[in-house]
C-alpha cells in the first residue's frame, strides 16, 4: 500500500475545527481514501481587534 501526503489549507469564519473539516470535505471531493490528517498550524485573520477568519494548515495522508 502506498500513502501519499498532500498539504492544504482550510478556512472558516466559525472556528479552527470548521477550518479543518472544510479542508477535508473539499479534498474528499477529488481524493479517495483519506486515512489521516496532521494539523501543522493554525492562523487567524483579525480586524478591529476581533478574529474574523480561521485557517488550518494540514498534511493529509491518503491511499494512492
Task: Identify the residue ranges that each predicted region occupies.
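Short, well-ordered alpha-helical segments
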Residues: 2-35
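A cross-kingdom feature marking charged/low-complexity
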Residues: 38, 42-64
